[in-house]
Every structure is written in C-alpha cells, then in structure tokens.
Regions:
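Extended, charged low-complexity segments
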Residues: 106, 115-185
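His-Asp-centered catalytic microenvironments across diverse enzyme cores
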Residues: 1-141
Length: 185
C-alpha cells in the first residue's frame, strides 16, 4: 500500500514514506513509465501492467528502480488504487504477523543531503551499516555487540535510545550477541 495524493487538477502522486533503502525520495507521478531521478544515478518509476501471478486483465502499479540508465529495471512492489479504511488496517496489524521482515530485523535509513538534493543514503540492516553514494554501496561498519549497535545508531543516524528502549531488544530475535543473535543483512 502507498498513499495516493490527488491534487485539485486531478493529478495523482504515489507517496511511499516507509519502503526504505531503494525507495523514492519524493512523490512519484502516478503515470506509467514516468522516470524520476532518485539518488545519484539511480532512477525510479511506476509502470501500470500485469504481473505473472495475476490474470492478464488485472493491472497493478509496480514500483521499479535501476541504479543507472544502462542497467535493467528491478521491480520491488506493486499496489492498486483500492482505497483502504481504518478498519482495514486494524485487521492487518503487525501484531497479527510477527514474522515479517520489519519485525524480525533492525532497520534504519538516513538520506544524505546537500541543500535540497539527496546524494546518497546510509543504511543499517541488523549488524551492518552501509553507505551508498553515487550508486555505489560500501560497508562502513559491522557491529559485534548490541552496545556497539546502539552507539552506531547515535553516530550514524542521530538516534539516542533511552534505557527502556535499550532493554526492549534483550532476548529478541534481532539482539546482537545475545539469545536472539541477529543475522547480518
């Protein structure tokens, strides 16, 4: 699901604020094959087409990304223009599905800006911090302990955890060096 914003003139934009690393850094015009520059040499677009899992007459909007014009497009997710209500979200609560990627991994992303332009991003997936600038990704740091990761959240993302928040990961699947022993991302 994404938010679809309709302007007074009828123009629609898809706004996805939660996808993560290869997500769009700005609203995308809801127009098939409209290419938007994202970060560095990375392009993103939406296409309105069928997917192999559906019948041929059912079209979905697909979010695609490529890291440079000469590379192929990668499809990441798809969505419809179906409207969802509060009651729909209640039954789709994360508490009903505790095994999805976002509840079993520690994730953070920060877009790097100079004035108004996004030129890169820094990402944390479990115990690994990666930096992506100019379409190239490199590992910045690998954490061995939960204490190191907590310090890294502050250093790389400006996130300071309270003592209660630090205690909250103990014994969980994503805990580093503990019972949960998270897996590298």
């Amino acid at each position: 699901m994404v938010n679809i914003v309709t302007l007074e003139d009828g123009t629609k934009y898809a706004v996805d604020v939660a996808f993560g690393g290869d997500g769009a850094t700005r609203p995308l015009l809801l127009e098939s094959d409209h290419i938007t520059r994202n970060i560095g040499t990375q392009d993103v677009r939406l296409i309105h087409d069928t997917i192999p899992e559906h019948t041929t007459d059912q079209k979905l909007w697909m979010y695609q990304c490529r890291n440079s014009p000469e590379l192929p497009w990668n499809s990441f997710y798809c969505f419809t223009e179906q409207e969802f209500l509060h009651s729909d979200f209640v039954v789709m609560s994360l508490f009903a599905s505790k095994t999805i990627f976002q509840t079993t991994n520690v994730l953070a992303i920060k877009f790097l800006r100079n004035q108004e332009q996004v030129y890169g991003k820094i990402m944390l997936v479990n115990d690994v911090v990666k930096m992506n600038t100019s379409g190239k990704t490199k590992v910045e740091r690998v954490f061995d302990t939960e204490e190191e990761r907590v310090d890294g959240l502050n250093k790389y993302f400006g996130i300071t955890l309270t003592q209660e928040e630090k205690e909250g990961i103990k014994g969980m699947h994503a805990e580093l060096g503990g019972i949960g022993a998270g897996v590298s991302g």
